[in-house]
Each structure stands twice: as C-alpha cells, then as structure tokens.
From Swiss-Prot:
Organism (species): Myxine glutinosa (Atlantic hagfish)
UniProtKB keywords: Developmental protein, DNA-binding, Homeobox, Nucleus
CDD domains, per database record: homeodomain
Localization terms from the record: Nucleus
Gene Ontology terms: biological process: neuron differentiation
Origin superkingdom: Eukaryota
Coiled coil: none
Gene Ontology CC annotation, any one: nucleus
PANTHER family associated with the record: HOMEOBOX PROTEIN ENGRAILED (PTHR24341), HOMEOBOX PROTEIN INVECTED (PTHR24341:SF6)
Name listed for the protein in its UniProt record: Homeobox protein engrailed-like A
PROSITE patterns, sorted: HOMEOBOX_1, HOMEOBOX_2
DNA-binding region positions on the chain: 1-41
Pfam families registered for this protein in UniProt: Homeodomain
Family according to the record: Belongs to the engrailed homeobox family.
Length: 60
C-alpha cells in the first residue's frame, strides 16, 4: 500500500520519469526498474484510454 501511494504521488508530480528518478524510486520501494517503468506506462495508458483520446495515426 505504501509503494502504491508513493508511485501515485510521483505520478501526480510527473507523468514521465528520468532514468535517474526511476532508479531512485526502484531502490526506495525495493522494486526493479522495469516494474516502475511498466507501472508508469500502464498508468499513462489508462488515463489516455479513459479520456477517449484516439490514436489517429492508427487509421493510416
């Protein structure tokens, strides 16, 4: 629960992480960098999907 709260707080502050920030978060939360990266990717995708934004490039 603390990990999730920390990830959400970080996401609120910045939707995209630098490599250094990702490494620090991984260390702080005892997760690996890939887990942090995927969590952020999924969170961005979820918000994009919920907002109804469509990828117009996919049509061509």
């Amino acid at each position: 629960a603390d990990q999730l709260a920390r990830l959400r707080a970080e996401f609120q502050a910045n939707r995209y992480l630098t490599e250094e920030r990702r490494q620090n978060l991984a260390r702080e939360l005892s997760l690996n960098e890939a887990q942090i990266k995927i969590w952020f990717q999924n969170k961005r995708a979820k918000i994009k999907k919920a907002s109804g934004v469509k990828n117009t490039l996919a049509l061509y």
